[in-house]
């Protein structure tokens, strides 16, 4: 996949692995972004199925600009590449954005993030995101008891479906990832949900 990381976030999670990036950044116009896409030879790769992931921070903080960028990108490319929007489930996406047939990579925060519940838990937004066809929910797990929070706050109220859930180990180093992965994988197997590692940390022992 190719990543476009947008600056800014609504939260400050204690385990965030990208803080250094979304606190800083550069301003690019559409032509400059297209120039980077062309120089990276991504147009052909998009046509062949490579994903284009728009992440943050919180991409929906720039929702009007994001919509404008995507509309112009589709016209320029003359194809509909697989585009993922990563978000933290605290900002409601507009109907215009939802109707663009994107993939939604949602990351609701649990209490282990140290983000106050009133900020991180937005049932109306979560239910709306769950209703989108290609939408899934990735939870960072630090201990087995975190599953109870998912069960009580997301599954029992029927905000999301079990098949939409992905569990990911909390880890900022390779050592942490290796230590926590078996516990999270076992939890995923037991609960019948998906497991995801953090390949960049496993390969390079770096957060970003």
Positions of the model-derived regions?
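Conserved Radical SAM active-site core
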Residues: 1-103
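Conserved AdoMet/S-adenosylmethionine-binding subsite of the radical SAM
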Residues: 60-208
